[in-house]
Every structure is written in structure tokens, then in C-alpha cells.
A protein has these predicted regions:
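Conserved P-loop
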Residues: 2-72
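Short, well-ordered secondary-structure micro-motifs
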Residues: 47-49, 74, 93-94, 124-128
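Conserved nucleotide-binding/hydrolysis micro-motifs of P-loop NTPases
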Residues: 41-44, 69, 88-89, 119-123, ...
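Phosphate-binding/switch region of NTP-binding enzymes
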Residues: 108-181
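Phosphate-binding/switch loop-helix module in NTP-utilizing enzymes
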Residues: 62-115
């Protein structure tokens, strides 16, 4: 996930997608750029991830509930970031209304956008890879798809796309990438 791509971050349960989005947001806030967070935000997680920022940096963070009116006033400029945490329901398929709402948001945004959703898992307990809700449609809207999951047998997270894979470990200052042995 480089610093300019707009991304659909598909995550498994307990994979810390919100923490990773906060870490990305922190980089923007530290640089004096605006971050708009659309959706739920855990106060305790936000405190631990960005609570050390000064008031001026935190003043560039806007948090709105998904579906709120007047969202156009929230949009960051081109050097900012829009995070839409949980763009669709975590159960079943994304509804037509959810896809249309996301499409409207993406059409308004002139900045980098990161949207998250819980990945679909094999209900039968099979070992198939998780799948992304409305993947083709979202990629058609300009979002690259990344998958975030917990590694088997360890505390690491694995971030993968169609052509990349990265292992992450969480430390006191957030996530860092680790090299394969």
C-alpha cells in the first residue's frame, strides 16, 4: 500500500485494520494534512495510536458517522486522506445502496481514499482465501484491493495484493514490516 494508491482494505476478524488505518492517518496528520474518518472509530484505539499528536495536528482530523448529511464539507484537499472504515455491512453482500453511497463518496474525493470491509470467509471452515465484497466494482472505481489477515501460528499480520505480500508486526509505535527469513 504505497502512499498514493486509493485502497480497499479487506480484513479478517481481529486483524487490526482500524489500527493500520489510524497509523496511515497519523502520517498525514503529522505532516499537517487533513484526514477525514468516515465511520466508527474506537476512542481507546485512537488515543493509543494518535493521542501523542499535538493539538494542531489533531485539529486536522474530522470524524463523521457513515451516512451523515453534509459529507461534502468534510472532504480533504488533494494532499489529504479519507478513511471510510466499514464501507458496507460485515454480513452478506454489499447492498446496492452501500455501493452507490461509496461511489458518490469516491466521486467527491480528490484525495487518497482507504475503505475497509470485513472479508467473506468460507462458512464451511475451508482453507480458501477470503474474498472482497464487490471487488470488481470497487476496482472499477479506482480502488486497489489489499487483504489483511493474521498469520497462522504467530502475532504477525499479512498484507497481500494481487502482486505483493508483506508481513507486519505490531510494536509500541505501530506496525512495521518484517523481512522474510
Amino acid at each position: 500500500m504505497n502512499n498514493t494508491d486509493s485502497v480497499h482494505l479487506v480484513h479478517g476478524p481481529g486483524s487490526d485494520a482500524e489500527a493500520i488505518c489510524l497509523q496511515v492517518s497519523k502520517g498525514y496528520l503529522e505532516s499537517g494534512q487533513m484526514v477525514a474518518w468516515l465511520g466508527s472509530l474506537s476512542p481507546s484505539l485512537a488515543r493509543s495510536a494518535i493521542g501523542d499528536l499535538d493539538g494542531a495536528a489533531l485539529g486536522n482530523l474530522r470524524v463523521w458517522e457513515k451516512g451523515a448529511l453534509g459529507i461534502h464539507r468534510l472532504m480533504p484537499p488533494s494532499n489529504g486522506l479519507l478513511v471510510m472504515h466499514g464501507w458496507c455491512s460485515p454480513i452478506g453482500r454489499a447492498t446496492k445502496a452501500e455501493v452507490q453511497y461509496l461511489e458518490e463518496i469516491l466521486q467527491m474525493a480528490v484525495c487518497r481514499v482507504v475503505v475497509t470491509s470485513l472479508g467473506n470467509q468460507d462458512a464451511g471452515g475451508g482453507r480458501t482465501q477470503m474474498t472482497a465484497r464487490s471487488r470488481e466494482r470497487l476496482e472499477g472505481m479506482g480502488l486497489s484491493t489489499w487483504f489483511l489477515s493474521r498469520s497462522e501460528g504467530g502475532p504477525e499480520r499479512v498484507l497481500t495484493s494481487s502482486d505483493s505480500s508483506l508481513r507486519l508486526v505490531r510494536g509500541q509505535d505501530g506496525f512495521t514490516s518484517i523481512r522474510e527469513p
